[in-house]
Design a protein with these regions (language model features):
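A sequence-composition feature that detects small, non-aromatic residues
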Residues: 6, 28, 33-34, 44, ...
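Extended aliphatic helical segments
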Residues: 5, 10-18, 32, 38-39, ...
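Conserved helicase NTPase motor core
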Residues: 14, 40-44, 143-230
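Conserved ATP-driven helicase/translocase motor core recognized via long
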Residues: 56, 60-61, 71-167, 210
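Acidic-enriched, low-complexity/disordered segments with a strong bias for Aspartate over Glutamate
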Residues: 2, 7, 12, 40-43, ...
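Conserved P-loop NTPase-based nucleic-acid remodeling module centered on helicase motor cores
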Residues: 1-97
Length: 230
């Protein structure tokens, strides 16, 4: 779009997709380490394959297995949203937690004598080994034990992926959105970060609810113009 903006002040206009804006926002405001790098899904698969022990090229070539990896990446980002109290409407790829996973968490909570709620989900996610030990002696039938094991394994892999990114200053595309949303949402007075009085969004139908929420948070409260095209 830049060549079509015939204005001497075009250098002050940001043109790009939401992920690119979020990356610029995070680095410009010192919200991530300066040496951080952004990774794509292929990089993410390579990282996770370190923990599964699988050949990453096998994963790339196997649609079913690659989808299972994607579900783990989505689980990592969704657990961040649950922990941070993001509205349910902003969560995407909710299929990363299926009916068996819910049943497994309910069973774990039953064994531990606690209510099944968001706090319990986050606690199980953050303490996989503890809950694995606590449920090891559970007398539930074989089927229930298997779904608990699968859930905890999936959560463990998501945690390992998360820690690897943190230790190596890596950000995936989910992180760009989540960290930007967190920062803007924590600045309700609009005093810490720049807001925009003119925002134009093209191909709005391609944006998910989290991206739209970020755009809303980026918009100044008064004297604003927001144009959505699609």
């Amino acid at each position: 779009l830049n060549p079509n903006i015939a204005d001497s002040g075009v250098g002050d206009v940001f043109v790009g997709n939401v992920h690119r804006f979020c990356s610029k926002f995070l680095f410009a405001n010192g919200l991530v380490a300066a040496e951080s790098s952004v990774i794509d899904e292929e990089d993410a698969v390579s990282i996770l394959a370190r923990y599964t022990g699988e050949d990453e090229y096998f994963v790339f070539g196997d649609f079913r297995r690659r989808r299972e990896y994607s579900l783990i990446f989505h689980l990592e980002s969704m657990m961040h949203q649950i922990a941070m109290g993001h509205p349910k409407a902003l969560r995407s790829h909710t299929d990363c937690i299926n009916g068996d996973d819910v049943k497994a968490m309910q069973r774990i909570c039953s064994v531990c004598g606690r209510a099944f709620d968001a706090a319990a989900m986050v606690d199980i996610y953050n303490n996989v080994e503890t809950y694995r030990d606590m449920t090891a002696a559970d007398t539930a039938d074989y089927g229930d034990r298997m779904i608990i094991q699968r859930l905890l394994q999936k959560m463990q892999l998501a945690q390992q992926y998360h820690r690897y990114k943190q230790q190596n200053h890596l950000l995936d595309f989910h992180d760009l959105l989540l960290l930007t949303y967190d920062a803007l949402n924590a600045d309700p007075e609009q005093s810490l970060y720049k807001r925009y009085t003119w925002v134009q969004v093209d191909e709005v139908q391609d944006l998910n609810q989290l991206q739209l929420a970020i755009i809303k948070l980026l918009t100044a409260r008064s004297y604003r113009t927001v144009i959505f095209l699609g």
